[in-house]
């Protein structure tokens, strides 16, 4: 496959048709394709970062405790929160929100995550997390020393809430979340809790995020703590808007060198496993051939022994029949018939008077021996047939396992190979685009 003669459009089409759908390369944690829910109220259409900061500087302090109904959060904070949550995967993450308040609005300008111990359903902030939070805020947002603190046009950012993730089970507050939020509201209000669901956000391509505060619901007997949801409004900087309107329509994919190395390691591992599988199959085949040859040799020996025994038995039977005939001839000669012209008067019968003989006159014992041998032969044939049947079943079972393992390894090999090729083609496509764009 030659790529030198292909255009950038053809390269993108090649990636889309051959690699993107099969290898699911579109499932990236980049938020460029994620849609943000716009506000439906006219007063927030022209909302921007600079207008919020100007309003904050003009705002006069008030002793009245407002009832917060809106959360204004920057797009930068949304991307950082979603990025932290997606990196956490099925494990919950936690962080701090930085911003200020405007009347009944809580404005979130920035955020940062905390080093916490999380599970799939719970996240706990230890003492080290609070120490990290204090040091981070002092280094990044403290303007007293005139150092490298982040400048938001004179507006000082404070802690206005916290955020955590609910991977896969939507945005709401659990009982522990309600207790945590209520405790923070009592001692450092204004304070808001933001919950994000990274799994559903990636699945639906829409940011799943909710902002909540607690409220005491008083009844006749006791007072219980509940929560309500605030309307979330996302704003952006004018600089980002201008960049978004004038930027090239190019989808920049975040390249990960580790993913390419992982794919290469998987490719090599699949090749090693396939080679080991073939070697094991060859060894088993040689062992089976040697076993089969030995079994055939033993069967041939048994057949030869059986034929020899049958021959000896038949010879013994024929010999017995011949001796019986000769004995009858001797009896006829010693009978009272004197028609013979041979003078047999002086015969000596002492050697023939005995009725006992060492020869087997009756043929039944030989027949019994033949029957036993035939029965033994039938049993051997049955066992040999059973062994051959079991051997065939084991052979079919081994062939099925080998085929299954071979298919799995071939699939893994093809997938890893496609990922590596897709990564290389992407790199070439990007370089080709730069060359065509900036070459006169």
Swiss-Prot record:
Q: Which UniProt keywords apply?
A: Cytoplasm, Hydrolase, Metal-binding, Metalloprotease, Nucleus, Protease, Signalosome, Zinc
Q: Which cofactor does it need?
A: a divalent metal cation
Name a GO molecular-function annotation.
metal ion binding
Where does the motif JAMM motif lie?
Answer: 164-177
Q: Does the keyword Nucleotide-binding apply?
A: no
What are the MPN domain coordinates in residue numbering? 71-218
User: Some GO term, biological process aspect, for this entry: which one?
Assistant: proteolysis
The places in or outside the cell where this protein is found are: Cytoplasm; Nucleus
Q: Does the keyword Cell wall biogenesis/degradation apply?
A: no
Name of the top EC class for this enzyme: hydrolase
Q: Where is this chain compositionally biased, Polar residues type?
A: 319-341
| InterPro entries membership | JAMM/MPN+_dom, JAMM_MPN+_peptidase_M67A, MPN
* EC numbers: 3.4.-.-
The entry's Zn(2+)-binding residues are 164, 166, 177
Q: Which residues form the signal peptide?
A: none
**Residues annotated as region Disordered?**
319-343, 376-400
* Pfam families the record matches: JAB
Which Cys pairs does UniProt list as disulfide-bonded?
Answer: none
Listed GO CC annotations: COP9 signalosome; cytoplasm
Q: Which domain of life is it from?
A: Eukaryota
Family of the protein in this entry: Belongs to the peptidase M67A family. CSN5 subfamily.
Assembly notes: Component of a COP9 signalosome-like (CSN) complex, composed of at least RRI1/CSN5, CSN9, RRI2/CSN10, PCI8/CSN11, CSN12 and CSI1. Within this complex it probably interacts directly with CSN12. Also interacts with RPN5.
**PANTHER family (UniProt xref):** EUKARYOTIC TRANSLATION INITIATION FACTOR 3 -RELATED
According to its UniProt entry, what is the function of this protein?
Catalytic component of the COP9 signalosome (CSN) complex that acts as an regulator of the ubiquitin (Ubl) conjugation pathway by mediating the deneddylation of the cullin subunit of SCF-type E3 ubiquitin-protein ligase complexes. The CSN complex is involved in the regulation of the mating pheromone response.
Q: Which named protein is this?
A: COP9 signalosome complex subunit 5
Q: Please give the organism.
A: Saccharomyces cerevisiae (strain YJM789)
